């Protein structure tokens, strides 16, 4: 049987979930959101009843419009996808903020980041569509599998469905999500405001063009752990075993006892990154940016902080500690502040593709925690360092690459853009190594990283 494309995965999932509820005589769907009959906009009785009928839980929800008459999944047009544990209050908040964003003729670009926000976007669709705005809610625990055919949880399901919608050729201008969507899109939206939404002349974005009719590479894994190990084997493991490569690259400069060297940045004492990782970050960052902006090609860096159970390791012995990304595009300015030092060949490394030694970046925050200045990276300090010291418990490495969906396949075998693949990998790594992974976002609230009481006695030197 031929493998489905990402477009077909979305269409099939919609057919099995939303469309089934819309066409069922025993569900209230479709549920309209806005009552326009009075002097001011109100919630419909159906919407109010629908949201109040649900207690706390694990919910995914979709705001959508319909291309009627509805005959198939392509007639369901997604406007916004979200997840929450408290759907009643979340839907009330969405209605109020939508109402406050109307009419869009009063929108003005105030020059701030995110000036044309998601509620402005949803309001624009509401005004321009020939359909009411509807809502659909599902308890994720009642869904056996996500659209890729594997078990899932609400934070991961949001990322998966957003990724499929953004990669779909039909929904580029109508879809209002900002998370799990490339920063480039928010940047482009902000330049034109409500004129971004053109329901009659939509055209595919570059991610949809890459994904179009691409069935990707088949995966053999029967579990999410299998998928993680397959992806690691094709990337980190492969590069570690490349005799001409430099991986694994230690994150920090250390002595033989794994005591991390220190450096002074202004008045702050900072953990010193290894020269090899600084070179790698600059090298990969240069593939994404030039002096004044972003190059065609990779839109940023994907990174995995990891440790090894053996040297040389098998894929199963490469233990992920943190997964993240640094997008070259900013949401307001084309060039992200995270890449300015790299783009302009500056010697400073304050931001440094998010691995900088400034107080709001990974190494800076970790240094502040290790030396008792702050506690933002408490979980990292507790798990990576011996108490009261700047000595690593184990050697810690960083794999970082300019992410090119046409070079690297996503973990489910399909092309996956940077803002999408980060969350997909976090979901797989969490399933495989839940007690080692230090990501706090895109994992369940009950994940060890979010429940463990981390402690660290700061180093005095």
Question: Over which residues does each language-model region extend?
Answer:
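Boundary/linker segments flanking structured domains
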Residues: 1-79, 84-321, 325-461
């Amino acid at each position: 049987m031929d493998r489905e494309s990402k477009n077909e995965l979305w269409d099939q999932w919609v057919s099995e979930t939303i469309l089934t509820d819309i066409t069922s005589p025993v569900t209230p769907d479709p549920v309209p959101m806005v009552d326009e009959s009075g002097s001011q906009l109100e919630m419909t009785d159906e919407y109010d009843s629908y949201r109040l009928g649900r207690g706390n839980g694990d919910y995914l929800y979709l705001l959508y419009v319909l291309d009627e008459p509805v005959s198939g999944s392509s007639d369901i047009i997604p406007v916004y996808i979200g997840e929450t544990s408290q759907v009643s209050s979340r839907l009330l908040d969405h209605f109020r903020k939508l109402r406050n964003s109307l009419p869009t003729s009063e929108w003005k670009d105030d020059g701030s980041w995110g000036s044309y926000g998601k509620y402005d976007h949803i309001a624009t669709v509401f005004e321009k569509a020939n359909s009411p705005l509807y809502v659909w809610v599902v308890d994720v625990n009642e869904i056996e599998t996500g659209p890729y055919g594997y078990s899932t949880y609400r934070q991961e399901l949001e990322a998966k469905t957003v990724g499929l919608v953004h990669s779909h050729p039909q929904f580029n201008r109508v879809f209002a999500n900002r998370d799990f969507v490339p920063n480039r899109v928010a940047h482009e939206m902000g330049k034109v405001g409500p004129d971004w939404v053109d329901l009659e002349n939509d055209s595919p974005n570059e991610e949809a063009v890459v994904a179009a009719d691409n069935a990707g590479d088949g995966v053999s894994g029967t579990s999410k752990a299998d998928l993680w190990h397959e992806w690691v084997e094709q990337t980190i493991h492969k590069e570690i075993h490349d005799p001409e490569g430099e991986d694994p690259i230690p994150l920090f400069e250390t002595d033989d006892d794994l005591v991390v060297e220190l450096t002074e940045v202004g008045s702050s004492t900072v953990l010193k990154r290894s020269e090899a990782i600084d070179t790698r970050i600059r090298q990969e960052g240069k593939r994404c940016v030039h002096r004044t902006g972003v190059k065609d090609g990779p839109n940023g860096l994907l990174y995995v902080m990891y440790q090894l159970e053996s040297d040389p390791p098998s894929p199963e012995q490469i233990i992920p500690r943190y997964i993240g990304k640094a997008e070259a595009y900013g949401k307001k300015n084309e060039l992200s502040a995270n890449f300015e030092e790299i783009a302009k060949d500056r010697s400073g490394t304050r931001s440094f593709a998010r691995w900088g030694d400034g107080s709001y970046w990974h190494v800076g925050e970790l240094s502040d925690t290790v030396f008792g200045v702050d506690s933002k990276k408490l979980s990292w300090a507790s798990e990576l360092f011996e108490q009261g010291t700047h000595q690593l418990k184990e050697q810690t490495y960083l794999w970082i690459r300019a992410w090119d969906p046409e070079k690297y396949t996503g973990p489910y075998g399909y092309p996956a853009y940077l803002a999408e693949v980060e969350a997909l990998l976090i979901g797989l790594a969490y399933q495989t190594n839940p007690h080692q992974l230090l990501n706090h976002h895109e994992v369940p609230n009950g994940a060890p990283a979010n429940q463990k009481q981390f402690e660290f006695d700061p180093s005095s030197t």
